[in-house]
C-alpha cells in the first residue's frame, strides 16, 4: 500500500515502538511501503511495465532526508533510471528545510546556508528536471537555484514517462 512519508513513518517506526508486542501492529508495519519502494518490488517481481513512451533526459534528484532515515535506499532513482535516455543524479545532501526551519524568520538564513551545497550541485548539473520525494525540500532548493522554476514530484515524471500527461 503506497502511502505518504508521515503515514509510513508512523506505521513502520512509531507504532511498533509504542506497541511492540501487538501482532496487528506488526502486520500493518509489514504492509506499508514508500511508493517507489513498492514499484521497485514490483519491478523485481517482473510485474512493473517498463514500456515507457518518453525519455526524461537529465534529472537532478535531491534524496529526501526521511528516505535516508527510513533506510529506503535510492528506489526513486532506481525506478527512473529504468527509463531509456534518462540519467538520474542523486544528491544526498540536506535541503535545509526541515519542516518550518526554512520559513521562520529566525532560522531562514541558516536554512539557506545548509541548502547551499545541494543548490550548487543542482545548478552545476543544469538538469532538464529537478525532483525530490519531499515537496517542501524540493521547492526550497528550486527557489534558491539559478534556473529552476519549481521542483517536480518523481511520480509526476513517471507519469510523463508513461505518456500519461
Language model region names:
Residues 11, 65, 95, 134:
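Short cysteine clusters
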Residues 37-39, 86-108:
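Short connector loops at secondary-structure junctions
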Residues 58-59, 130:
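Conserved hydrophobic helix-helix packing surfaces used for dimerization/oligomerization
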Residues 63-78:
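Active-site glycine- and acidic-residue-rich loops that bind
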Residues 74-91:
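Short helix-loop-beta junction
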Residues 99-154:
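C-terminal structured "cap/appendage" subdomains that terminate the fold
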Amino acid at each position: 500500500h503506497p502511502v505518504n512519508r508521515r503515514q509510513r513513518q508512523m506505521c513502520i517506526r512509531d507504532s511498533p515502538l509504542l506497541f511492540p508486542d501487538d501482532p496487528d501492529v506488526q502486520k500493518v508495519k509489514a504492509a506499508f511501503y514508500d511508493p517507489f519502494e513498492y514499484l521497485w518490488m514490483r519491478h523485481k517481481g517482473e510485474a512493473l511495465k517498463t514500456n515507457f513512451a518518453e525519455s526524461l533526459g537529465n534529472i537532478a534528484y535531491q534524496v529526501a532526508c526521511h528516505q535516508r532515515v527510513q533506510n529506503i535506499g535510492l528506489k526513486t532513482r532506481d525506478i527512473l533510471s529504468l527509463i531509456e535516455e534518462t540519467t538520474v543524479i542523486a544528491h544526498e545532501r540536506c535541503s535545509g528545510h526541515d519542516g518550518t526551519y526554512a520559513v521562520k524568520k529566525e532560522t531562514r538564513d541558516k536554512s539557506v546556508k545548509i541548502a547551499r551545497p545541494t543548490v550548487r550541485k543542482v545548478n552545476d548539473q543544469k538538469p532538464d528536471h529537478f525532483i525530490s520525494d519531499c515537496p517542501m525540500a524540493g521547492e526550497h532548493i528550486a527557489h534558491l537555484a539559478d534556473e529552476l522554476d519549481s521542483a517536480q514530484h518523481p511520480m509526476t515524471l513517471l507519469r510523463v514517462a508513461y505518456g500519461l500527461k
